[in-house]
Amino acid sequence: MKFRKGRPKIPRLISEEPQFKLFKPAGTPGTELESEVLTFEELESLRLVDYLNQPHEEAADAMGISRRVFWNILKSARKKVADALINGKMIDIGGGYYKIRECNYEDECQRGRNCRYGVSNCLTLKKDSE
């Protein structure tokens, strides 16, 4: 029997599963390409920091993890994306250990789970209501 050391792993919170889950270089059949698997939480870390320009601390809080764990996820995601772009690999997005974040502000947002910017808006609403 194998025992795991340390704390139990908790699911990372993501805003939603992405609409597009596969990217590949144009003009090459997917069967001829190597692929990199980017987990949903790795994509979420890229979305929060590189797309929404959130500080690491806010992004880590939004995902329900420590800054150190967040940094490791982000570093892994950036390495995989860079490898795929430089070496012409396919990016397959899926898997990981995650949970869809519950939004308690559907009335204010009026978009519910389809909100692409739920993290920053919800964090702002949360701060305003406290």
Curated annotation (Swiss-Prot):
UniProt protein name: UPF0251 protein MmarC7_1642
Similarity remark: Belongs to the UPF0251 family.
Pfam families the record matches: DUF134
Annotated organism of origin: Methanococcus maripaludis (strain C7 / ATCC BAA-1331)
Domain of life: Archaea
